[in-house]
Amino acid sequence: MIIPVRCFTCGKIVGNKWEAYLGLLQAEYTEGDALDALGLKRYCCRRMLLAHVDLIEKLLNYAPLEK
């Protein structure tokens, strides 16, 4: 859905790193190297970006029925 603002475990802010992470992946970085470049060293914070599934664009296609 929407990238969480903070890490669920330690509380570090990770929401502002999503766009930069995608940019690094487009620049042919591996996932691990991209996370290292963003300064995410803890595995709890790394999993927040690695496990995120970006579904918001697909969900916007389904508008609720108007009455």
UniProtKB/Swiss-Prot annotation:
Zn(2+) binds at residues 7, 10, 44-45. One of its GO terms (cellular component) is nucleoplasm. It is found in: Nucleus; Nucleus, Nucleolus. InterPro entries: RNA_pol_su_RPB10, RNA_pol_suN_Zn-BS, RPABC5/Rpb10. Keywords: DNA-directed RNA polymerase, Metal-binding, Nucleus, Transcription, Zinc. One of its GO terms (biological process) is regulation of transcription by RNA polymerase I. Pfam families: RNA_pol_N. Its main location: nucleus. GO terms for molecular function: DNA binding; DNA-directed RNA polymerase activity; zinc ion binding. Belongs to the archaeal Rpo10/eukaryotic RPB10 RNA polymerase subunit family. Component of the RNA polymerase I (Pol I), RNA polymerase II (Pol II) and RNA polymerase III (Pol III) complexes consisting of at least 13, 12 and 17 subunits, respectively. Pol I complex consists of a ten-subunit catalytic core composed of POLR1A/RPA1, POLR1B/RPA2, POLR1C/RPAC1, POLR1D/RPAC2, POLR1H/RPA12, POLR2E/RPABC1, POLR2F/RPABC2, POLR2H/RPABC3, POLR2K/RPABC4 and POLR2L/RPABC5; a mobile stalk subunit POLR1F/RPA43 protruding from the core and additional subunits homologous to general transcription factors POLR1E/RPA49 and POLR1G/RPA34. DNA-dependent RNA polymerase catalyzes the transcription of DNA into RNA using the four ribonucleoside triphosphates as substrates. Common component of RNA polymerases I, II and III which synthesize ribosomal RNA precursors, mRNA precursors and many functional non-coding RNAs, and a small RNAs, such as 5S rRNA and tRNAs, respectively. This is DNA-directed RNA polymerases I, II, and III subunit RPABC5.
